[in-house]
Amino acid sequence: IVGGTAVTPGEFPYQLSFQDSIEGVESHFCGG
């Protein structure tokens, strides 16, 4: 679902991962 509209599987073949590093420990905190 993009902007409230269904899309075709594979139409957007990528993902996003926001990550942070605190005191040398990397962690994922959000994605889309």
Curated annotation (Swiss-Prot):
Database matches in InterPro entries: Peptidase_S1_PA (IPR009003), Peptidase_S1_PA_chymotrypsin (IPR043504), Trypsin_dom (IPR001254)
Compartments where found: Secreted, Extracellular space
Uppermost EC category: hydrolase
Enzyme Commission code: 3.4.21.4
A GO MF term: serine-type endopeptidase activity
Cysteine-cysteine disulfides: none
GO BP, sorted A to Z: proteolysis
Tagged with keyword Transmembrane: no
GO-annotated cellular components: extracellular region
Keyword Hydrolase: yes
Pfam family for this entry, one: Trypsin
Catalytic activity, reaction form: Preferential cleavage: Arg-|-Xaa, Lys-|-Xaa
Organism superkingdom: Eukaryota
Functional description taken from the UniProt entry: High efficiency toward native protein substrates including collagens.
Family: Belongs to the peptidase S1 family.
Descriptive protein name: Trypsin
Native source species: Penaeus monodon
